[in-house]
Design a protein with these regions (language model features):
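Basic, amphipathic alpha-helical/coil surface patches used to engage anionic, phosphate-bearing ligands
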Residues: 1-215
């Protein structure tokens, strides 16, 4: 038993050392990438290291590929969101349907987002894109320090052909992991990751739904 315990402790120590070394390598690459992108685009100075790291991880820590992708993102952002953010007055036809809600945090500290697909109506594609950016910015502003993910509950009840104009929406939200579950097990499935106090009341939880524009 003592040999087994010593073996387990040794493995845990080795894992900790490897994790520390990996973090040091990642942090070093974040610093290198920051210097490169700031030299190309001074506006990169306004972005925190978590954002830089996110792009690095998306390109398997390849600094060149991550830098190119990040600079492309900055150029897009400057063109599509010239004022730095999307205002509610720019997306009135999307907000009126109350289809996206911001809740509390799940058990892992991730913000909870609820999307009602059946409330989506075909509309101007450019306004839809602005709405997606508005939504993602709202979500990011609610993320605790160090958190990089959020949970999304995609409720497709009532969704049909008239709601199918969602290609741009789904593309922008492709980072989401969508899990389809049977209605009879929906609440228990959600409670695996969300405390009842944070679960939306629409799913027999205790927290009222909060429209994205009021979050």
């Amino acid at each position: 038993m003592e040999l087994l315990e010593n073996g387990v402790e040794a493995n845990e120590l080795q894992d900790s050392i490897l994790k520390m070394e990996s973090n040091e390598i990642e942090q070093s690459k974040v610093g290198i990438m920051r210097a490169l992108v700031e030299a190309e685009d001074p506006s990169a100075k306004e972005v925190d290291n978590f954002m830089i790291r996110r792009f690095l991880r998306a390109r398997d820590l390849d600094i060149e590929k991550a830098s190119n992708l990040f600079l492309k993102y900055l150029r897009w952002r400057q063109t599509f969101v010239p004022n730095g953010s999307i205002g509610a007055s720019e997306i009135p036809n999307e907000l009126v349907h109350n289809k996206v809600f911001m809740q509390g945090l799940d058990k892992n500290g991730r913000p909870i987002v609820v999307i009602f697909g059946g409330r989506h109506k075909q509309n101007n594609i450019e306004e839809l894109k602005r709405f997606v950016v508005y939504t993602l910015d709202k979500i990011c502003s609610r993320m605790p320090g160090g958190q990089e993910k959020f949970m999304c509950i995609a409720d497709l009840k009532g969704w049909g052909y008239s709601n199918s104009d969602i290609r741009g929406y789904l593309a922008a939200l492709s980072i989401l992991q969508i899990i389809f579950v049977e209605n009879k097990s929906l609440r228990s499935t959600l409670l695996n990751d969300i405390d009842e106090s944070q679960l939306p009341d629409a799913y027999a939880g205790q927290l009222p739904l909060v429209p994205i524009q009021d979050a």
